[in-house]
C-alpha cells in the first residue's frame, strides 16, 4: 500500500543544530526517517476460541474466524515481517468478560493466553474490574511475572488493598531501535461509576495524559503513543486537547472499525461498519499531526500501523490497515494445542444441566418491559435471603442481564451467560422513599437512550412513560407470600435485595447507597444456579402475575407472552 503523505511530499531533514534532548533520542545528523510499527488489538473479551462472524460460538468450521490462534499467528508474522521497522505489540484492554471461558475460568485463562505472546505494553479496560480489584489483582500479578507493563495514567488506587502490590504505571519508556518511545495509558474517566472498582477512581484522562506527556518530554522522549481505553469519541477529544504533546492514539472501548473505504483489503461487510479512516488524522494548528487507530473488537482484526518520524519526533508519513482474521488466516499450531485442555474444561463445566424451563427466558425485552429472565433472576435474589423472619423484595436493573435462555434444559453455562457480570447479591435496609426513587430512576433514559427498567420480585409497579422523568412511577405495592398487596409506604424501612453494582450506587442509582445494614452475598450467577437447582423446573405459573405494568410506552408495546420476546418496537 502506498505511503500516505501529508503537507508537501518531501523528505524532512532535521536541523543540524538539534536540541540536546532531541539529540539523545535521535543521533546527531541522522537524516533517514525513523519507522515505528504499531501492532495492536483491543477488546478481546475472552474470545480465545474461534467464533462466527457475530463473535458467538462457531459451529461450522469452514466459517470460523478470529480466535487467539489466528490473532497470535498474525502478530508473530507481522513482528517478523516488520522487524526492520521497529515493531511494538500493544494491547488496549478489555481482555476480560464476554464468553463462558471467562465466566467459568476468569483471570486464570486470560492471564495464561496473554502470557503466551506478551505485549510490549497494555492498558486496562473497564471490564477488567468486573469482579472488583480482587479479581484483577491476581491477573496483574501473573502478567508482572512476565514483565508485561500495565499503564494507566489516570488511575488512582486510593489505598485499595487488593491492588497494594500491583504495579500499574502511568507510562513506560521503551527503547525501540535507536529511539525512545513513550507509551501512556488511559482508561475511560467514568469507569469507577459503572464498574466495581472498589476504592479505585479514574481522573480526567485528558489532563492525566497531558501531565504525563509533559513529564516524558522532560526526559527527552519525543515520540509518544497513548494506549487508550476511552472510546473513539474520547480519543478524538484527547487528540484535540492534548494533541500538541502526543503522536499516536491506539484506541479501544467503542469497538470501532477504522478502515480507509477505498482500501482493497477484506473486512466483515455484513456485520462491521466502518467508522472512519485508518488512521484518523487530527492536524493541530502548529502543523503537528496526531493519528488515531482502533481495531474493532473480539479478535476479529489485528491493527498494523507503520509511522515514519523525523528526528524531532514529528509524524512524516504512515501506512497500514486492520487485518481481518477471516477463515483463510492460519492458526498458530502451538496455541491451538494450548487451547485444548482449557476448551475441555469449559465444556465440562458449562454443559452440566441444572434444571429446565417451560418458558422462553427473554432478555431482549428487559430494557423496555417486564421480562421473564428478569423475573426469574429477581426471584432468585429474593429467595437467597427469605426465611421465617425476613421476606425481602428484590430489584435488579435491566443492564444486569446478557443472554436469553431458550425453553428446555438450563445448563451452568446458560445460567452464567445470562448473568455474567459478577455482582454479589446483597441485602440492604432502605426507606420506601428511596426504593420508590430507585425504581423511578429505572424509567429514565441513559446515555444510549435506553431505559433500565426495574425487574422486581415481591413488588407490583405501575409506571406511566408519558409523565416527566422521576414522576413516572404511579404506584408500588408490596406483594406478600400469599399474594396480598399493600401500598409501599415511603416512611417505612424495607429489606431490599439488589446486585452489589446497584448497592454501590452505579448507573445513577445513588439513592441505593443510602441503604444500611448491608449484607454481602454470593455471586449473582451462583445465586441463579442454586435457585434453578432448587426449583428444578421453571414453570409457567411463576409468571402469571404482572409485576411491572408500563402505560403510554413511547417506543413500542409490551406483551405478557411466555414463548417469545415481549417487547415489540414501533
Curated annotation (Swiss-Prot):
Expression (tissue specificity): Saliva (at protein level). Salivary gland (at protein level). Not detected in midgut.
One record GO biological process: digestive system process
Keywords in alphabetical order: Blood coagulation cascade inhibiting toxin, Glycoprotein, Hemostasis impairing toxin, Hydrolase, Metal-binding, Nucleotide-binding, Platelet aggregation inhibiting toxin, Secreted, Signal, Toxin
GO molecular-function term, one example from the UniProt record: nucleotide binding
Chain positions carrying an annotated carbohydrate: 108, 287, 326, 387, 552, 555
Superkingdom of this protein's organism: Eukaryota
Alphabetized SUPFAM superfamilies for the sequence: 5'-nucleotidase (syn. UDP-sugar hydrolase), C-terminal domain, Metallo-dependent phosphatases
Coiled-coil segments on the chain, per record: none
Induction of expression: Up-regulated after blood-feeding.
Listed name of the protein: Apyrase
Amino acid at each position: 500500500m502506498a505511503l500516505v503523505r501529508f503537507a508537501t511530499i518531501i523528505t524532512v531533514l532535521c536541523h543540524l543544530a538539534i536540541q540536546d534532548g532531541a539529540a539523545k533520542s535521535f543521533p546527531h545528523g541522522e537524516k533517514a526517517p525513523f519507522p515505528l510499527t504499531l501492532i495492536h488489538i483491543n477488546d478481546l473479551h475472552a474470545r480465545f476460541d474461534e467464533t462466527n462472524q457475530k463473535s458467538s460460538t462457531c459451529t461450522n468450521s469452514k466459517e470460523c474466524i478470529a480466535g487467539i490462534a489466528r490473532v497470535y499467528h498474525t502478530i508473530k508474522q507481522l513482528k517478523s515481517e516488520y522487524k526492520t521497522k521497529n515493531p511494538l505489540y500493544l494491547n488496549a484492554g478489555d481482555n476480560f468478560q464476554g464468553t463462558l471461558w471467562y465466566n467459568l475460568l476468569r483471570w486464570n485463562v486470560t492471564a495464561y493466553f496473554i502470557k503466551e505472546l506478551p505485549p510490549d505494553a497494555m492498558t486496562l479496560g473497564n471490564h477488567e474490574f468486573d469482579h472488583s480489584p480482587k479479581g484483577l489483582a491476581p491477573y496483574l500479578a501473573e502478567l508482572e511475572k512476565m514483565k508485561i507493563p500495565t499503564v494507566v495514567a489516570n488511575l488512582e488506587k486510593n489505598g485499595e488493598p487488593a491492588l497494594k502490590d500491583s504495579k500499574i504505571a502511568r507510562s513506560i519508556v521503551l527503547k525501540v531501535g535507536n529511539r525512545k518511545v513513550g507509551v501512556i495509558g488511559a482508561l475511560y474517566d467514568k469507569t469507577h461509576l459503572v464498574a466495581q472498582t472498589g476504592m479505585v477512581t479514574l481522573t480526567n484522562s485528558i489532563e492525566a495524559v497531558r501531565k504525563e506527556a509533559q513529564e516524558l518530554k522532560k526526559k527527552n522522549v519525543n515520540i509518544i503513543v497513548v494506549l487508550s481505553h476511552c472510546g473513539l469519541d474520547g480519543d478524538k477529544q484527547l487528540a484535540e486537547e492534548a494533541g500538541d504533546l502526543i503522536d499516536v492514539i491506539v484506541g479501544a472501548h467503542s469497538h470501532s472499525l477504522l478502515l480507509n473505504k477505498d482500501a482493497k483489503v477484506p473486512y466483515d461487510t455484513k456485520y462491521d461498519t466502518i467508522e472512519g479512516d485508518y488512521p484518523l488524522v487530527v492536524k493541530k494548528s502548529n502543523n503537528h499531526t496526531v493519528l488515531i487507530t482502533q481495531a474493532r473488537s473480539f479478535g476479529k482484526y489485528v491493527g498494523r500501523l507503520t509511522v515514519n518520524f523525523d528526528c524531532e519526533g514529528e509524524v512524516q508519513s504512515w501506512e497500514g490497515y486492520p487485518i481481518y482474521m477471516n477463515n483463510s488466516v492460519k492458526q498458530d499450531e502451538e496455541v491451538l494445542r494450548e487451547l485444548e485442555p482449557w476448551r475441555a474444561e469449559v465444556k465440562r463445566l458449562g454443559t452440566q444441566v441444572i434444571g429446565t424451563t417451560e418458558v422462553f427466558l427473554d432478555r431482549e425485552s428487559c430494557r423496555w418491559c417486564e421480562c421473564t429472565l428478569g423475573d426469574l433472576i429477581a426471584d432468585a435474589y429474593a429467595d437467597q435471603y427469605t426465611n421465617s423472619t425476613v421476606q425481602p423484595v428484590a430489584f435488579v436493573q435491566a443492564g444486569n442481564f446478557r443472554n436469553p435462555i431458550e425453553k428446555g434444559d438450563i445448563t451452568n453455562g446458560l445460567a452464567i451467560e445470562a448473568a455474567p457480570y459478577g455482582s454479589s447479591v446483597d441485602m440492604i435496609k432502605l426507606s420506601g422513599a428511596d426504593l420508590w426513587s430507585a425504581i423511578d430512576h429505572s424509567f429514565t433514559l441513559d446515555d444510549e437512550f435506553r431505559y433500565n427498567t426495574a425487574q422486581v420480585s415481591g413488588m407490583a409497579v405501575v409506571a406511566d412513560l408519558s409523565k416527566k422523568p422521576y414522576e413516572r412511577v404511579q404506584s408500588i405495592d408490596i406483594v406478600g407470600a400469599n399474594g396480598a398487596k399493600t401500598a409501599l409506604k415511603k416512611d417505612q424501612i424495607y429489606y431490599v435485595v439488589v446486585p452489589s453494582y446497584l448497592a454501590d450506587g452505579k448507573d445513577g442509582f445513588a439513592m441505593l447507597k443510602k441503604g444500611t445494614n448491608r449484607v454481602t452475598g454470593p455471586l449473582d450467577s451462583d445465586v441463579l444456579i442454586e435457585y434453578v437447582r432448587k426449583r428444578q423446573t421453571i414453570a409457567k405459573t411463576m409468571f402469571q402475575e404482572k409485576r411491572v405494568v408500563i402505560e403510554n410506552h413511547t417506543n413500542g408495546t409490551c406483551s405478557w407472552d411466555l414463548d417469545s420476546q415481549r417487547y415489540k418496537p414501533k
